């Protein structure tokens, strides 16, 4: 986007200036929303880039949500896909504009020390502090370093990841989100959720743009996950 620069005669705020430029640039865009992360960096970014910037975000039902603004006009927009298995975790990074695979990596699941199968891990997370321990094992000890490896390989920073998709079994989904999975192993075997929408990287502590949506592949049973 190339924005008009403010003058003494044109004192429109930066946010409104960007919103008007974005509405003019995208067909079907009827409303523009800027995330807090974007607004915080907007003034400095616009002036350092002489008001010529690249934006990243989502356009849904006419509403453009701007998740980032940068003066680097060739900055890539990246998506991340992760398969969480009980033993192995695999991830890929994709260029969201071209579909190109830009990085791939695998690692062991950090939860393995708490049990080789989901039942033993549910038992472990049922102990005091267990939910947090199991979540940290998959998130902080596995996904964070795995994503760092992929970002280094792709030559990007994690804040260029604007969407992440995760597939795993029902128990792994609960443990990743820090949700008690004990009801899954107790008759009548009812999980807290099969699918969860609206979660961001900031909510979860996932290494990405803070407003990147984390998409969970929906599960279809207590022991049948979205990774089948």
Features from the language model and the residues they span:
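Extended, hydrophobic alpha-helical segments in both membrane/secreted and soluble proteins
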Residues: 87-91, 101, 143
């Amino acid at each position: 986007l190339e924005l008009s620069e403010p003058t003494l005669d044109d004192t429109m705020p930066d946010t409104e200036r960007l919103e008007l430029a974005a509405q003019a640039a995208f067909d079907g865009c009827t409303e523009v929303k800027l995330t807090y992360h974007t607004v915080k960096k907007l003034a400095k970014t616009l002036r350092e880039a002489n008001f010529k910037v690249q934006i990243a975000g989502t356009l849904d039902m006419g509403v453009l949500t701007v998740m980032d603004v940068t003066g680097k006009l060739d900055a890539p927009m990246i998506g991340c896909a992760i398969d969480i298995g009980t033993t192995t975790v695999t991830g890929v990074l994709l260029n969201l504009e071209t579909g190109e695979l830009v990085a791939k990596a695998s690692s062991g699941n950090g939860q393995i020390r708490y049990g080789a199968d989901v039942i033993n891990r549910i038992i472990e997370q049922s102990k005091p502090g267990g939910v947090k321990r199991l979540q940290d094992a998959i998130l902080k000890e596995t996904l964070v370093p795995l994503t760092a490896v992929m970002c280094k390989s792709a030559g990007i920073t994690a804040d260029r990841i604007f969407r992440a998709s995760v597939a795993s079994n029902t128990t792994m989904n609960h443990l990743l989100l820090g949700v008690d999975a004990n009801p899954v192993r107790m008759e009548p075997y009812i999980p807290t959720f099969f699918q969860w929408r609206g979660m961001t990287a900031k909510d979860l502590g996932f290494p990405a743009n803070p407003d990147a949506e984390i998409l969970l592949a929906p599960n279809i049973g207590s022991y049948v996950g979205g990774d089948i």
